[in-house]
Amino acid sequence: MSLKPKVALSQDFLLNLSKLPSGVQSKVMKWAILFQSNPKSTSINYENIHAASDTNMKSVRIDGDWRGIVFKPDRGDVYVLLHVNKHDEAYRWAERRKLIINPVTGAMQMIQVEEAAVV
């Protein structure tokens, strides 16, 4: 018996959704409904973000200019829509963040990854 995957929307995503242009908001909501109904759908093309600190961060196409950043687990069944932005900004956002499990509470936490200083 396999359980239905769980889909979550991050606080960052929810706080920033209203700041997106209205035309983009409607595309994001349409995509989010598809994502929520089946995050394993073949119509969702998860793309690797090569410079990402977290290999579970994936890019998804909202339209030609806008990308969603999604946590797609290697194993497990919890998917999270984390962020939406224009292509390059979305990738930069993903490159600087990592989703971890808090060892005390067991909750998912987003951390910002510091760039190592070049000496």
What are these regions (language model features)?
Residues 2-4, 15, 58, 62-119:
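Enriched for short, Lys/Arg-rich terminal
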Residues 2-20, 24-27, 31, 46:
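N-terminal "first-domain core" detector
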Residues 11-12, 53-54, 75:
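Short glycine-enriched loop/turn motifs at secondary-structure junctions
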Residues 34-60:
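A short, surface-exposed loop/turn module that caps and links secondary-structure elements
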